[in-house]
């Protein structure tokens, strides 16, 4: 016969990182946008903790809530033993958009072609709404969800705005 060996309960290699290092939150604002990526196969978040539960609370699923003004550290403890932390600053004011990314400066569409714009706001906890506007809706139309549609040949600008920040996209329809 042949000899078979098996390793049971092999140690997990501690890898992984959070999508943010720090976030602002308004008092009573919650966010579930903090996530862990790059985990080793089989690794998972075992617990979430807050360094000061009077300032920031965090649920078992990683939903973070600002309770009162101040700073606290939220830590995700992985099954592999690795700890990942971020700083949460709780403020009284609305969380404003500091930048808009994830959009190209130039796009080309065919007539009747559609494309969904997916702007990424920084910080991820921004409370300011995103709005969209076309400089010429006869050439390129845009709806409130950021879906642009090529209407006829030509070019127009789409303005993506959140708070005082804006991003311009030049769209050419062929």
Annotate the PLM regions.
Residues 1-174:
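Extracytoplasmic soluble-region selector
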């Amino acid at each position: 016969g042949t000899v078979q060996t098996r390793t049971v309960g092999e140690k997990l290699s501690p890898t992984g990182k959070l999508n943010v290092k720090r976030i602002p939150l308004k008092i009573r604002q919650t966010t579930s946008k903090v996530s862990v990526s790059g985990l080793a196969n089989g690794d998972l978040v075992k617990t979430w903790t807050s360094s000061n539960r009077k300032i920031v609370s965090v649920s078992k699923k990683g939903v973070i809530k600002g309770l009162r003004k101040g700073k606290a550290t939220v830590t995700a403890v992985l099954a592999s033993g690795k700890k990942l932390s971020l700083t949460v600053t709780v403020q009284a004011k609305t969380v404003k958009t500091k930048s808009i990314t994830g959009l190209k400066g130039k796009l080309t569409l065919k007539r009747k072609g559609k494309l969904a714009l997916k702007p990424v706001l920084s910080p991820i906890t921004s409370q300011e709404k995103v709005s969209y506007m076309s400089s010429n809706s006869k050439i390129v139309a845009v709806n409130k969800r950021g879906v642009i549609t090529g209407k006829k040949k030509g070019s127009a600008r789409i303005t993506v705005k959140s708070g005082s920040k804006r991003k311009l996209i030049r769209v050419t329809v062929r």
